From Swiss-Prot:
It comes from Caldanaerobacter subterraneus subsp. tengcongensis (strain DSM 15242 / JCM 11007 / NBRC 100824 / MB4). The active site is at H41, H87. The gene is purL. This is Phosphoribosylformylglycinamidine synthase subunit PurL. ATP binds at Y44, K83, D488, G525. Mg(2+) 2 binds at D109, D260. It is an enzyme of class 6 (ligase). Belongs to the FGAMS family.
């Protein structure tokens, strides 16, 4: 076979392993099946040994990692279903379809579990939009997400977007979907019942996306442009029909098991379901509805055509299934049956064209513990001499520059393209600390966020990853939600490089430590490696998707200033940390220093305090202090509430560091004057420092530091800078 396995991404050792499993050389169809199932994208062969360190158990966990999505109990016989996935490589090549099918795929993962999807979030990373290609990627990724979500009628309620040089040419598109299901109606992908029919439902099968999973397990290069056929094409209207047909099907007792067809198409759905159930499956390819003529067994088994599901049905119920799908104008074809021998047997024209043990494709995939070493530049990049950072003269200009930086400026240009109000349950819309979606027929709501500062993770993956978890949990607490579960998307470079494996390992350890401390289980997730462009890796970017529970939706809090004369209080301690900060990057062009330190116990106390203050109705607004420090948080709350602020700070720090330090575990709250003493007392009981720093008043932002006026600007001037930046960047030539 002239080492064709290498072209399919398999190593010589892996090929030898396949021969020893089968006791013979594989044919081309079998080789294709192994190449996709043993790719990093499907097998997690470089990350699985590390992922076992993540905490996955908890009192609310109904389903942890290993199924199509994670499931958490939220009481009242309801559960929340959540998952995040990447579509980075396809989006780099064909951004519109890459992003759109990323959204389509994650939605299918949710309704496969029996849940109705209620919200989408997207976590995006791009290069600096100062060249045509980057702008093209941004425009088309956002349009792809918007069109798919808007057409299928699921609101895109939140997410996060960062712009850094390291993502140029390799953008990150991580899509998260959340659904609600009654606990006794959860569906799983565990095939059982010898002789039960296997059906493919939904769209027809074509040649799109063949080998997409293997493609997603390689570095991007000049040649990647030629791999556009590896990018699938999505049809959101077809998916809407598929969603409704599946939910109607789940109301019957016909379904034994169901799995969506994502990466590796029919191959992965068949072997994953069979191996979970300890059974085999026989598939007759002549019965698969095709949209193109002359397709080979290899092409049919590896096609990643969208909007398809594989269903194991109770014997004799085939007609019931066909009736439902016919009503919705969709295919439902019986293509095979469950067998007792543990083999995936594929038949075409009456002949066996592939026959492999199901478990050999899934559980027996190789696993690698790679060599690691600390990157040679790591110590150097952490060094920051504060004397290199001269205190600026004009602090008004600095404040304008920081809040109009790409990472802090309003992302309205992006989210205004999304319909975030469809289904009418969105309580807190994009642009706030966390999105909130109410659950119909209850007083409950779910708060959602995605977070990760890749720059911190570049400077220190262990600490940066802890901060990503802490920031996500803090964002949920700011709206009054108790964090209940994590879904993570680990975006890294090539793990075969020792420095990258070191980043991946330390990042996972950091996430594990933070999740254990906060007692938040990781219930699902995704790993995306080989994110490199012309040999340069992206910043390590472990995106944390998190859900929080609000028992009473009337008690939520938001970040906008509400009332004149309210007292502004900072919770938490400013340690004067500008390493890795937005201030350092924007005003001095530096990405260096230690990222802010994080004390997880202090963070926990802050979060518990804010939840108590919100629950008891003692505060009028709350906003976490993160990128851009106190000054950015102040301006964001002021803009959101259309009210100015007068601030007076006493500090031993330099004025610029006091304002723009990104020290963790801090929040900005506003309190009615008569409640201030009670708030300070409760903060003291929680051992959280609390400092009165000013009042909400007027239409200007005025800041005095140690008695000296440092900043005095009309809010509308700041708002203009903050609101207009991304639109301006995207429209200029």
């Amino acid at each position: 076979m002239n080492k064709i396995w290498r072209e399919l991404g398999l190593t010589d050792e892996e090929y030898e392993k396949i021969i020893s499993i089968l006791g013979r050389e594989p044919n081309i169809t079998e080789l294709g099946m192994y190449s996709v199932m043993w790719s990093e994208h499907c097998s997690y062969k470089n990350s699985k040994p590390l992922l076992k360190y993540l905490p996955t158990k908890g009192e609310r966990v109904i389903q942890g990692p290993g199924e199509n999505a994670g499931v958490l109990d939220i009481g009242d016989n309801l559960a929340v279903v959540m998952k995040i996935e990447s579509h980075n490589h396809p989006s780099a090549i064909e951004p519109y379809q890459g992003a759109a099918t990323g959204v389509g795929g994650i939605i299918r993962d949710i309704f496969t579990m029996g849940a109705r999807p209620i919200a989408l979030l997207d976590s995006l990373r791009f290069g600096i939009p100062d060249d045509k290609r980057t702008k093209y990627l941004i425009e088309n990724v956002v349009a792809g997400i918007a069109d798919y979500g808007n057409c299928i009628g699921i609101p895109t309620v939140g997410g996060d977007t960062y712009f850094e040089e390291s993502y140029k040419g390799n953008p990150l598109v991580n899509a998260m979907c959340v659904g609600i299901v009654e606990k006794d109606k959860i569906k799983k992908g565990i095939a059982k019942g010898i002789g039960n029919p296997v059906m493919v439902v939904g769209a027809t099968t074509g040649r799109d996306g063949i080998g997409g999973a293997s493609f997603a397990s390689q570095e991007l290069s000049e040649e990647s442009e030629e791999k556009r056929p590896s990018v699938q094409v999505g049809d959101p209207f077809m998916e809407k029909l598929l969603l409704e047909a599946c939910l109607e099907l789940f109301e019957t007792d016909a379904v034994v098991a169901i799995q969506d067809m994502g990466a590796a198409g029919l191959t992965s759905s068949s072997c994953e379901m069979a191996s979970r159930g300890g059974v085999g499956m026989e598939i007759d390819l002549d019965k698969v509805p095709l949209r193109e003529e002359g397709m080979t067994p290899y092409e049919i088994m590896l096609s990643e055509s969208q909007e398809r599901m594989l269903v194991v049905v109770k014997k004799g119920k085939e007609e019931d299934v066909q009736k439902i799908f016919k009503k919705w104008g969709l295919n439902a074809a019986t293509i095979g049956k469950i067998t007792d021998d543990g083999m995936i047997r594929v038949i075409k024209d009456g002949k066996i064209v592939a026959e492999v043990p199901a478990k050999s494709l899934t559980e027996d995939a190789p696993q690698y513990v790679r060599e690691e070493e600390v990157p040679k530049w790591q110590e150097e990049v952490k060094k920051l001499d504060i004397n290199e950072v001269k205190p600026p003269e004009d602090m008004n200009k600095v404040l304008k520059d920081v809040i109009s930086s790409l990472n802090i400026a309003s992302k309205e240009w992006i989210y205004s393209q999304y319909d975030y109000m469809v289904r009418t349950d969105t309580v807190i819309t994009p642009g706030m600390d966390a999105a909130v979606v109410r659950i119909k027929g209850t007083r409950k709501a779910i708060a959602l966020t995605t977070d990760c500062n890749g720059r911190y993770c570049y400077l220190d993956p262990y600490i940066g990853s802890q901060i990503a978890v802490a920031e996500a949990a803090r964002n949920l607490c700011m709206v009054g939600a108790k964090p209940i579960g994590v879904t993570d998307c680990l975006n890294f470079g090539n793990p075969e490089k020792k420095e990258i494996y070191w980043q991946l390992k330390n990042s996972i350890f950091g996430i594990a430590k933070a999740c254990e401390t906060f007692q938040i289980p990781v219930v699902s997730g995704n790993v995306s490696l080989y994110n490199e462009n012309e040999g340069e890796a992206i910043y390590p970017t472990p995106v944390i998707g998190m859900a929080g529970l609000i028992e009473d939706v009337s008690k939520i809090c938001t970040m906008d200033f509400k009332k004149e004369r309210d007292v502004i209080i900072i919770l938490g301690e400013n340690k004067g940390e500008i390493g890795g900060s937005e201030y350092l990057k924007v005003c001095f062009g530096m990405v260096k220093g230690q990222p802010p330190q994080i004390d997880l116990e202090k963070e926990k106390r802050l979060q518990e305090l804010v939840l108590k203050l919100i629950d008891e109705g003692l505060i009028n607004s709350s906003h976490d202090i993160s990128e851009g420090g106190f000054a950015a948080a102040l301006v964001e709350s002021a803009i959101a509430g259309k009210k100015g602020a007068k601030i007076s700070l006493q500090t031993s720090l330099r004025a610029d560091i006091e304002l723009f330090s990104e020290s963790q575990s801090r929040a900005l709250i506003t309190v009615s004057p008569e409640k201030v003493d009670e708030v300070l007392k409760i903060a003291y009981e929680h051992q959280v420092p609390a400092q009165k720093v000013g009042v909400v008043e007027g239409k200007d932002i005025v800041i005095d530091v140690n008695g000296k006026r440092i900043i005095d600007l009309p809010l509308e001037v700041l708002e203009e800078s903050w609101r207009g930046r991304i639109k301006w960047e995207m429209e200029r030539n």
